[in-house]
C-alpha cells in the first residue's frame, strides 16, 4: 500500500500519476473502513480525495498554508500529513479529531468546524505573511456539497 509510506506531503511528490491514482483508492478504502466502524463525515471527504492529493503534490505544506472552510473534509489531508495511522489502524481511530487542529499538526492552522470562515482566515494568513516579508501561498479550500473551489491568495 502506498498510503503506508506517506509520512508527509514530500512523499506524495515521489509518486507517479498511476501511483497517485492507487493512493486515491487506498485513501477511500481506508476512509470507508474507519467511518463504517467509527463514524464521521463520509461525503465531504470522499469528494475531495483527488483534489487533496493534487494540492499536496503542487504546493509545499506547511510553508504554503491550506485553510479548510469545512474542515470535516480534511481527513485525506490528515492522512497525507503524518496522521495516516488514525485512519488505517482501529486502535488509533481516536488519535485525531474530526476537524483541522493545529495541536495535531503543523499542517493545520486553525481549529475550524463549519463554513464561512476560511476567506477571512486565509486573508489574515496572507497579510501576516506579507508583513513578515515571508514567502508561500495561502490556499482557501472552499467547498459545499454540490461544488468546490480552491483559491490561492498570493
Model-based region annotation:
Residues 23-24, 29, 41-143, 151:
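Cofactor-binding active-site loop characterized by glycine-rich and histidine/acidic residues
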Residues 1-34:
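Cofactor-/ligand-binding subdomain signature composed of acidic, glycine-rich
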Residues 16, 143-145:
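Alpha-helical hinge/cap motifs
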Amino acid at each position: 500500500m502506498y498510503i503506508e509510506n506517506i509520512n508527509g506531503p514530500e512523499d506524495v511528490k515521489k509518486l507517479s500519476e498511476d501511483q497517485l491514482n492507487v493512493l486515491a483508492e487506498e485513501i477511500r478504502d481506508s476512509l470507508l473502513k474507519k467511518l463504517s466502524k467509527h463514524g464521521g463525515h463520509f461525503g465531504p471527504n470522499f469528494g475531495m480525495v483527488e483534489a487533496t492529493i493534487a494540492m499536496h503534490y503542487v504546493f509545499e505544506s506547511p510553508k504554503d498554508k491550506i485553510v479548510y472552510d469545512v474542515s470535516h473534509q480534511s481527513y485525506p489531508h490528515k492522512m497525507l500529513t503524518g496522521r495516516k495511522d488514525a485512519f488505517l489502524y482501529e486502535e488509533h481511530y481516536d488519535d485525531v479529531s474530526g476537524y483541522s487542529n493545529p495541536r495535531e499538526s503543523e499542517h493545520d492552522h486553525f481549529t475550524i468546524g463549519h463554513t464561512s470562515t476560511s476567506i477571512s482566515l486565509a486573508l489574515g494568513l496572507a497579510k501576516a505573511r506579507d508583513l513578515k516579508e515571508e514567502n508561500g501561498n495561502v490556499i482557501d479550500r472552499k467547498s459545499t456539497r454540490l461544488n468546490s473551489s480552491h483559491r490561492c491568495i498570493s
